[in-house]
Each structure stands twice: as C-alpha cells, then as structure tokens.
C-alpha cells in the first residue's frame, strides 16, 4: 500500500485503492457526520465516469429557500436576500485551497451540492402556483475537503486540511469508514400512491396539446410523483438503487432529506474552457437482448422512426445549442453527435452532444444560469414551458429535474440532471418521473410511460431480495 503524507490543502496525495476494504464505498453513505455527499461513477472507467467523490463536514455552506439565501460557516450564519448563484462567490471566500499541479484531476476541492428545479424561480420571472410539498432547500451547496477515487487507475486521492493532525490521511479515512456498519434488511410499503389519477394526467396531456397547438411551446415534460412508506435509512436506499439501476452519474446527498439520484445525463461541463452538454431524449428499457448489438441497434432504429420521439429530440438539441450559445464564443457551438445509442444496465438511451468554447468573461455561476434547468426535463421554449408546468403539475418539482455536481476551486464545473430522483424523508419515499409531450402524443400512453418509469425505480429497490410489491394506480 502506498503511503500518504499529511499535507496542506494545496497537496493531493495518492493512495492505492487497497487501503480500503470492498464495502468502504457503501459505508461512506452511512456517515454520522453532517452533510455527507457521494458523487459516484458506477458503469466503468470511461472518461465521462472516471472519478467518484466522497465529502464530509463542510467548511462552509450556502442554502437557499424561497427568497432567502443563508451563508453559513463555522462561526456565523449570515442571511442574504440575493441570487443564490451569486452567493456561491461568497462561500468560496471561506476556503483556502489553491489548485495543485495535478492538472489531470479536474475536481481538487470546491463547492459541491445541488440546485433544485425550483431555484429557477430565483433566476427567471416565473409564477409560483404549485404546492410546496417537500420542504428541502432550493439550493444546498458546500465547500469540502474530499476523497477522490480514480476508477481508471485504481487510486484514491485524499485532500486534507492543514490542521487535520499527524495521522496518515489514508489511515484516518480507513478508520472512519471501518467504524460504520451497514444493514441491508428493510421494508418498503406495499402500495405507492400517485399525485395524478390516470384520467387527471390524460387531461393534463390534452391541455398541453392545446398549448402546443396555439404555439405557446413546442415540447414539454409532464411529471407525476409517487409516495409510499419505508422503514429504511436513506443510505440503505441509495445502495439498493445503485445495485438495481447503475448509471454513469450517481449521487447520495444528505441535505435535510436524503436525495438519491441515478443519472445518465450531463447538463453542463466546463474543462479548460471547453463546454459540453449531452441531452438524452429517447429510451429503450429492458436489458440488452440476446441478439446482441445488432438486435439492439434494430430496436434503436425503430425508435428513431417514431415521429413523436424524433420531433422531441430535435427540439431539445436545438434548445441546448441555444443555451451553450449564450456563454460560448460566436461560431464555436457545434452539434457533435445526434441520436447516438448508449447502453447501460437495463436501459439504452439515444444521446446527443453539443459543444462550444467558453467566452473569456464568463464565470462558473454564469454557466449554471445559462443551462439551468436542463431542457430535456422542461421543454421548449424553457421559461414559458416552466410556467405551464407550474400550472398543471399539482406539486412543485423540488430537486427533480434540478442538477447535482460541483464548482471546483480551479474554476471548472460539472453538473448532471437529477433524474431519476428518489427522496427519503420522515419515513416516506418519494419518487418522481415524467415524459415528453408533443402535438401527436397519446394521453393514455404518456400516463403509462411516466407511471412505469416510477414503477421501475420502486421495483428495483425490491429486486435484491426478491420481494413482491403490489403497485397501485389510484383511480
């Protein structure tokens, strides 16, 4: 095992992965400390899912709810009625990390956390109509020291503060995770109610089609929320979700509620002023077929031939291209890929890629503002569509369709869209899913699509022990 010297925050020291046991990453979620967060790559050592990030005990935090932004450090709580993205600049002043000379490591400490979908009300003039059922913050972002796992090279990097002490940081981290235990036995309630009946959802689709026909918008995502009882800790649910639904970008965030995400979709990446977004529109569910890649490609071709899905994908790519153009150098924005097939465990997606070169005067918070929330989970045009979503969906979306990721000290950012999304809160499990609606959508089919997306998540939490859960559709 490689030794790891205790250094200043400006020094990242590598540790061989064998300094941890196999269950360490599971126990990282079960932390007795405050604000534990885990951003994890599960689908392999590709460039897009190379690193997993573990953070504990923030140096300073910024939280926003409604019109109030709270900046918190170890000594004080400062309330500021301001744009929460601007507040990130203030929380960065609490840290003292200079970027290291390890240029290959993009995240060397910084602000990590999430922005709920509803934070858009602070960024755009959007009416407030939906019921605020979930009371979590609209933004929860903090500065952290961190542990970084490189899947490609099987190396752990530890970033530690100057005052951490004399113990080898690898030993300190190993002592921490080995002190935790994990119990995989828990129950999920037999029935999950929905905030839509099938008739009400179909009526919502019809109303959306009226808006589409009048030219208010060109495509929209309509979501429904499921809720049921659980007897489990949120970290237990996360580990079960990770096993049942592995994805390139997974997240566990302990900020008031337990937020659990398995996302295949990047909303915005900035590496050395190179911008990248990867919208997903088009999904093939079920594990890869026995016929192999050729049969799967045939299924993808069939999907591409569906006019409704083709129209949806083209509109979303155009929306993301416009978002990148707001912060990109003129003439640099390119659609690098459109409708490419990517395979994951249990699902295949049709993915596009839009890139551009960042304008020199643009800061990290400006990038988030330009691309938030992701167009695949709102619709086009974005602001008008969000107003209509607020009118039709019974509750606010909260974290669903928001974003999770980081802004690094060195200036780069990486955020993913929070889909699929589970919340564990006060003995209840909330699950939210939706689907894209266009002019030729069939209301009953749209209801079934969104309902089954939620059911797939809930069933996945039970598959590990072979339990049978009766799912309900409230009529």
From Swiss-Prot:
Q: Could you cite one Gene Ontology molecular function of this protein?
A: 4-amino-4-deoxychorismate synthase activity
Keyword hit for Protein transport: no
Output the SUPFAM superfamilies linked to this UniProt entry: ADC synthase
Q: Which reaction does it catalyse?
A: chorismate + L-glutamine = 4-amino-4-deoxychorismate + L-glutamate
Annotated GO biological processes are: folic acid biosynthetic process; L-tryptophan biosynthetic process; tetrahydrofolate biosynthetic process
Q: What is its EC number?
A: 2.6.1.85
Q: Which top class of enzyme applies to this chain?
A: transferase
Annotated pathway: Cofactor biosynthesis; tetrahydrofolate biosynthesis; 4-aminobenzoate from chorismate: step 1/2
What InterPro entries does UniProt report for this protein, alphabetically?
A: ADC_synthase, Anth_synth_I-like, Anth_synth_I_N, Chorismate_C
Cofactor annotation: Mg(2+)
**What keywords tag this UniProt record?**
Folate biosynthesis, Magnesium, Transferase
Any Pfam family from its record, for instance, is: Chorismate_bind
Q: Does the keyword tRNA processing apply?
A: no
Q: What else is known?
A: The catalytically active amino acid residue K274 of the E.coli enzyme is missing.
Function text: Part of a heterodimeric complex that catalyzes the two-step biosynthesis of 4-amino-4-deoxychorismate (ADC), a precursor of p-aminobenzoate (PABA) and tetrahydrofolate. In the first step, a glutamine amidotransferase (PabA) generates ammonia as a substrate that, along with chorismate, is used in the second step, catalyzed by aminodeoxychorismate synthase (PabB) to produce ADC.
Q: Which family does it belong to?
A: Belongs to the anthranilate synthase component I family.
Query: Which proteins does it associate with, and in what oligomeric form?
Result: Monomer. Heterodimer consisting of two non-identical subunits: a glutamine amidotransferase subunit (PabA) and a aminodeoxychorismate synthase subunit (PabB).
Q: What is this protein called?
A: Aminodeoxychorismate synthase component 1
Species in which this protein is naturally found: Streptomyces lividans
């Amino acid at each position: 095992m490689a030794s790891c010297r205790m250094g200043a925050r400006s020094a990242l020291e590598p540790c061989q992965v064998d300094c941890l046991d196999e269950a360490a990453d599971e126990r990282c979620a079960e932390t007795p400390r405050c604000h534990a967060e885990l951003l994890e790559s599960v689908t392999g050592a590709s460039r897009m899912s190379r690193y997993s990030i573990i953070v504990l005990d923030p140096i300073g935090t910024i939280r926003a709810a409604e019109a109030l932004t709270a900046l918190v450090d170890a000594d004080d709580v400062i309330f500021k009625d301001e744009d929460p993205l601007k507040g990130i600049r203030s929380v960065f002043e609490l840290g003292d990390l200079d970027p290291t000379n390890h240029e290959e490591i993009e995240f060397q400490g910084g602000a990590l956390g999430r922005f709920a979908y509803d934070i858009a009300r602070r960024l755009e003039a959007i009416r407030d109509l939906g019921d605020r059922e979930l009371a979590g913050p609209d933004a929860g972002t903090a500065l952290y020291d961190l542990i970084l796992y490189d899947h490609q090279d099987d190396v752990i990097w530890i970033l530690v503060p100057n005052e951490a002490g004399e113990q080898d940081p690898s030993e300190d981290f190993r002592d921490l995770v080995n002190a935790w235990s994990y119990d995989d036995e828990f129950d999920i309630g037999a029935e999950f109610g929905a905030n839509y009946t099938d008739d009400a959802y179909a009526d919502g689709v019809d109303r959306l089609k009226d808006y589409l026909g009048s030219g208010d918008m060109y495509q929209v995502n309509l979501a429904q929320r499921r809720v049921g009882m659980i007897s489990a800790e949120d970290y237990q649910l996360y580990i079960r979700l990770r096993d049942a639904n592995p994805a390139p970008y997974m997240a566990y965030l302990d900020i008031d509620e337990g937020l659990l995400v398995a996302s295949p979709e990047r909303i915005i990446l900035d590496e050395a002023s190179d911008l990248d977004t990867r919208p997903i529109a088009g999904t093939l569910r079920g594990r890869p077929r026995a016929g192999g890649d050729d049969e799967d490609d045939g299924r993808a071709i069939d999907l591409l031939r569906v006019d409704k899905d083709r129209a949806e994908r083209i509109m979303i790519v155009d929306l993301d291209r416009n978002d990148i153009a707001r912060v990109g150098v003129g003439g640099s924005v390119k659609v690098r890929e459109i409708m490419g097939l990517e395979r994951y465990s249990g699902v295949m997606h049709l993915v596009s890629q839009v890139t551009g070169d960042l304008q020199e005067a643009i800061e990290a918070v400006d990038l988030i503002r330009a691309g938030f929330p992701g167009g695949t989970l709102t619709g086009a045009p974005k602001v008008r569509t969000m107003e209509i979503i607020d009118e039709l969906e019974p509750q606010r979306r909260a974290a669903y369709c928001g974003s999770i990721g980081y802004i690094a000290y060195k200036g780069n950012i990486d955020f993913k869209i929070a889909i699929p999304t589970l919340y564990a809160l006060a003995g209840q499990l909330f699950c939210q899913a939706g689907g894209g609606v266009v002019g030729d959508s069939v209301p009953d089919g749209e209801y079934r699509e969104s309902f089954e997306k939620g059911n797939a998540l809930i069933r996945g939490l039970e598959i590990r022990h072979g339990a049978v859960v009766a799912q309900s559709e409230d009529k």
